[in-house]
Amino acid sequence: FSSSLLEAFNDSELLFVMGHELGHHVYGHHQIPIGYVLRGRQPPPADLALDLFAWSRYAEISADRAGAFCAQDLESVARALFKLASGITDERVVRFELHEFLAQVDDMLAFDDKPGQGAPKQDWFSTHPFSPLRVKALKLFHESDLMATTGMDKPTLEDQVHQIMSLMEPDYLQGKTDSSRAMRDLFLGAAVVIANAYEGISKKERD
């Protein structure tokens, strides 16, 4: 935490940030050193490498839920994610609108109408979901029986979150054909190159 963060975030937003970081600790996310695994002398199989990136994105979703439970206010949670992602904390510069943020995900889902194509390649190697996806997943979390007594059940929640998260995943993760395996091998090499080029996954991404 920095003094600038304390000054720019209100109490509910800070509760989300602190709860998110505590969630990482409680769930043991730091026990899987993704950067170290990718840069090791024995690179992992392609399937595992892609799964690690996907796992990291889901780890962020679970930590977000811990933060959201602490904050108990979706608007504050979404605004905190916007501030963290954009670096813009002054509403005189840009005013955050939750419905516009969520509409970005609806647009992405509507555009994703080509079965078998999967997400753009650069998205596969991201350790964090896009902020609009995180906010959409948190909206679903707030609408579930984990947060509301009459909300959707957990299996339905997870199914809907998986649909959103698939926007950043390649179809090759599930493919069993020789071509799918070849593509996984190819993109494993790209993942290792990316990790080495940037001297591994940054501390911010590991957190």
PLM-predicted stretches and their roles:
Residues H20, A63, F130:
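Divalent metal-coordination and catalytic microenvironments
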Residues D64-A68, A191-V192:
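Amphipathic alpha-helical segments within well-ordered protein domains
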Residues H24-H25, A66, C70:
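Short alpha-helical functional segments enriched in proximate histidine and acidic residues
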Residues R57-A59:
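Conserved phosphate-handling catalytic cores of large alpha/beta enzymes
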Residues S131-D207:
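Non-catalytic terminal regions of proteins
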Residues L5-L15, L22-L38:
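Catalytic Zn2+-binding segment of zinc metalloproteases
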Residues P44-W55, A68-D159:
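Active-site-proximal gating segments in proteases and membrane effectors
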Residues Y36-A46:
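A short mid-domain helix/strand-loop element embedded in enzyme catalytic domains
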